[in-house]
Amino acid sequence: MAKKAQRITLYKKIWGNIRKYQYLHDLSDEELAKILELTTRTLYTYDKDPSGLTLKRVQSFIDCSGMELDVLTSA
């Protein structure tokens, strides 16, 4: 019996792309936390489970980064 493939949720895609942007633009965790208006501890929580990521946080990131939502949600 084949093992079911684990799905990547939209939360994980968005969070992964935010972390990718952070890496490519050489932002510290503190700088990213300031952009998203949260604490660095919450960043680490989102690394484990990004389902707590809100639209307000995503919108804050889009406003600061200039990234389009469709790019943020792409794989």
Residue map of PLM features:
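Residues in the recognition helix of alpha-helical DNA-binding motifs
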Residues: 21, 35, 46, 75
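Key DNA-contacting residues within the recognition helix of helix-turn-helix
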Residues: 15, 44-45, 73
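A short, Lys/Arg-rich alpha-helix, primarily the initiator
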Residues: 1-25
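Recognition helix of helix-turn-helix/homeodomain-like DNA-binding domains
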Residues: 37-53
